[in-house]
């Protein structure tokens, strides 16, 4: 579809990339985001926050974000990766404007955007994305061992005794 840019700062500072939105879109990605897997119709901050006690359905932003998504509709699939670490906003159909056809946009705090567009099946798009940004190396075996975190341990009565008993059980199970 047609693309448009905020070159004259009509919509404020930073850069904005608009794309025509199809009504049957399913959108997947963006990293650590709450809610359903299909992100169509939502708006997200592209930023990080320490969101302890978050609501898994609605809290945004969370700990990690990736300004990359895959869009699937009746025409096919494409992926877009915005190559930036700057804070931003991704609107995937939340905003509706009576004077414009359906659209989605990515707005970045940077004055220019660098982005990559991938075409193919969802698997092919993910493979292209991984070749572009690099793959995560396989972590060492020990990193798959048992791990837990909670603030409750520090305030529990006899916390050291409870932790020692817990660790003994974990060792007995070879975790």
Residue ranges and their predicted role:
Residues 1-143, 147-154, 159-161, 167-172:
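Catalytic and substrate-binding clefts that recognize carbohydrates or anionic sugar/phosphate headgroups
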């Amino acid at each position: 579809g047609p693309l448009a840019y905020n070159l004259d700062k009509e919509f404020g500072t930073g850069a904005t990339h608009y794309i025509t939105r199809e009504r049957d879109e399913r959108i997947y990605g963006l990293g650590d985001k709450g809610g359903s897997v299909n992100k169509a119709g939502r708006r997200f901050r592209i930023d990080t926050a320490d969101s302890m006690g978050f609501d898994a359905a609605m809290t945004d932003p969370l700990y990690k974000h990736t300004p990359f998504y895959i869009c699937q509709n009746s025409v096919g699939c494409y992926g877009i990766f915005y190559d930036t670490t700057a804070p931003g906003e991704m609107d995937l159909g939340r905003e509706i404007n009576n004077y414009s056809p359906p659209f989605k946009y990515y707005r970045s705090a940077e004055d220019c955007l660098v982005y990559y567009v991938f075409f193919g099946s969802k698997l092919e798009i993910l493979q292209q994305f991984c070749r572009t940004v690099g793959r995560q190396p396989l972590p060492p075996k020990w990193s798959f061992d048992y791990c837990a975190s909670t603030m409750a341990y520090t305030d529990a009565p006899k916390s050291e005794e409870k932790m020692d008993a817990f660790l003994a059980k974990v060792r007995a199970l070879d975790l």
